[in-house]
Amino acid sequence: MSWGGFKKAINRAGASVIVKDVDKTMDKDFDVEERRYKTLKTAGTNLQKAAKGYLDNIRAITNSQVTIAEIIYNLYEESKQGQSLYSNVGTYYMQSVKEFDEETVKQIDGPYRETVLDPIGKFSNYFSEIDEAIKKRAHKKIDYEQCKAKVRRLVDKPAKDAAKLPRAEKELSMAKEIYDELNDQLKAELPQLIALRVPFYDPSFEALVKIQLRFCTEGYSRLAQIQQYLDPASRDEYANGLLDGKIDDMLAQMQGLSITSLGK
């Protein structure tokens, strides 16, 4: 910050001491548009974070699936010697989730960034620029109010130097012009930005739905194929509500093993 900017900041900080209610400038139309903008900014920022989180979570899910598949594969590898019904299911399951990760998830990464993340990010980048413009308006508003207060005091209590009032009035006129120009620009352009939000986000929303659909349908399609390698009897028991009882019987058998009580 320059020395001149520093002095202005100090003067603005003390403005509330010398600026009275009569000097303050109110613009309800701007206040309404600013509130609408802040609502848009909050939604846009949250959408950007959530969109990135969605892609990160997809990666996390598929990575976990691959890890689980590798563990299950190793478990069923041990059962091959006993000619288990599930001798090959671990292999098919691992192959399926790895193909899903490589052929689907990694392939949607680029399109998702291009059609969802990047456009949402570009829109959100404007928020910092608009925030700076609103901040600048607030500073110019304080400058304008200070000039109004200065003229008011000189009118109420004339100075010995007769030239002070004309100088103050000139400063007031310049401050008002600067403030009005920026204030009017924001009042005109903030509604335009807000109106653009739907047509801007629409293509990204459509792309998001299509990518989600592909992720879900291809994931379901691949995993559904694994069912043919599962024991048909177990599927029927699950459908008829009998599988829980079978699992309870197995747990009872495990508890009956002497090895489970060795640590007691």
From Swiss-Prot:
Disrupted-gene phenotype: Leads to defects in actin polarization, endocytosis, bud morphogenesis, as well as increased sensitivity to calcofluor white and Congo red. Also shows a strong defect of hyphal morphogenesis and attenuated virulence.
UniProt KW keywords: Cytoplasm, Cytoskeleton, Endocytosis, Virulence
InterPro entries to which the protein is assigned, alphabetical: AH/BAR_dom_sf, BAR_dom, BIN3/RVS161-like
Keyword Cytoplasm found: yes
Taxon lineage: Eukaryota, Fungi, Dikarya, Ascomycota, Saccharomycotina
Annotated organism of origin: Candida albicans (strain SC5314 / ATCC MYA-2876) (Yeast)
GO MF entry, a single one: lipid binding
GO biological process assignments: actin cortical patch localization; actin cytoskeleton organization; conjugation with cellular fusion; endocytosis; filamentous growth; filamentous growth of a population of unicellular organisms in response to biotic stimulus; fungal-type cell wall organization; lipid tube assembly
UniProt-recorded name of the protein: Regulator of cytoskeleton and endocytosis RVS161
Pfam families: BAR
GO cellular component, one term: membrane raft
Induction of synthesis: Expression is induced in absence of HOG1 under non-stressed conditions.
Location in or out of the cell: Cytoplasm, Cytoskeleton
Record's function text: Component of a cytoskeletal structure that is required for the formation of endocytic vesicles at the plasma membrane level. Plays an important role in virulence.
PROSITE patterns given in the database record: BAR
Domain (BAR): residue spans on this chain: 15-239
PANTHER family listed in its UniProt record: BRIDGING INTEGRATOR 3
SMART domains in the record: BAR
Top-level lineage group: Eukaryota
